[in-house]
């Protein structure tokens, strides 16, 4: 094994690319230069040029998998800091997230159906707006294709992270709570990360949106599909 295939080297390359991409977006302010999108694109080119397989590259990923769970738990910190506001606005928060879940599932399912997608594809697209682990479990329970769901979830997150705040600016939605909840619910972890870059307040509401939408989607997607006659 040459040094290019060393798991620590590949991990360092990943961190380095992401750090530079983060700096680039911060300097330019261009949302299209999303650090996650840039990192993925550059890594694909790097792996192709060096003829390193994905399996070899992914060995380095096992070194940091442990930190995924603590990172999710850490999302509770900004939530706690906004606890009083959340308590006061609990009903509109819950209703908006419920509505967002229902509209999100129905819209993608109907569009896919109108375009002639098979039931298997529809089941794979239905949980598009929640984090990958939840989305894949929902897809498995429905009989969809988990790997397709994972790819769709990443694409949805990137689009939400790039276009989310721009879209809300055009519609004159200025409330940090509304923006954070919307982005967390629609663009899950990527949207939450983008919100955290703005402020802890935005990040707190995005974390809440991500969590509530994940719960509602897991619970309601099978029922929605049955009501639409697709399950």
Identify the function of each model-found stretch.
Residues 10-13, 83-108, 150-159, 209-215:
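Entry/N-cap segments of selected transmembrane alpha helices
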Residues 121-148, 154-155, 167-170, 174-212:
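Alpha-helical membrane segments and immediately flanking helix-loop junctions
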Residues 2-80, 88-92, 96, 100:
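Helical membrane-embedded segments and adjacent short helical loop/helix-boundary regions
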Residues 77-90, 113-114, 137-155, 170, ...:
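Helix-loop-helix hairpins and the membrane-proximal interhelical loops
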Residues 95-135, 156-171:
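Transmembrane alpha-helices that form the ion-translocation and gating core
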Residues 37-49, 69-74, 96-108, 126-136, ...:
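Small-residue-rich segments of transmembrane alpha-helices in multi-pass membrane proteins
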Residues 113, 220-231:
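Juxtamembrane boundary at the C-terminal end of a transmembrane helix
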């Amino acid at each position: 094994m040459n040094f290019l295939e060393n798991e620590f080297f590949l991990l360092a390359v990943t961190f380095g690319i992401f750090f530079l991409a983060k700096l680039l977006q911060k300097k330019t302010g261009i949302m299209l230069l999303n650090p996650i999108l840039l990192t993925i694109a550059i890594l694909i080119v790097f792996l192709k040029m060096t003829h390193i397989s994905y399996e070899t590259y992914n060995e380095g990923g096992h070194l940091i998998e442990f930190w995924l769970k603590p990172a999710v738990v850490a999302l509770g910190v900004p939530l706690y800091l906004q606890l009083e506001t959340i308590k006061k606005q609990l009903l509109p928060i819950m209703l908006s997230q419920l509505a967002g879940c229902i509209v999100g599932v129905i819209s993608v399912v109907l569009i896919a159906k109108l375009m002639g997608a098979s039931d298997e594809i529809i089941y794979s697209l239905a949980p598009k707006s929640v984090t990958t682990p939840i989305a894949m479990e929902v897809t498995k329970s429905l009989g969809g294709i988990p790997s397709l769901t994972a790819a769709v979830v990443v694409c949805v997150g990137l689009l939400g992270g790039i276009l989310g705040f721009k879209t809300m600016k055009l519609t004159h939605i200025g409330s940090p709570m509304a923006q954070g909840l919307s982005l967390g619910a629609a663009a899950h972890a990527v949207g939450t990360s983008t919100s955290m870059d703005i402020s802890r307040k935005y990040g707190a509401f995005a974390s809440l949106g991500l969590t509530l939408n994940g719960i509602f989607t897991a619970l309601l997607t099978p029922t929605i599909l049955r009501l639409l006659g697709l399950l």
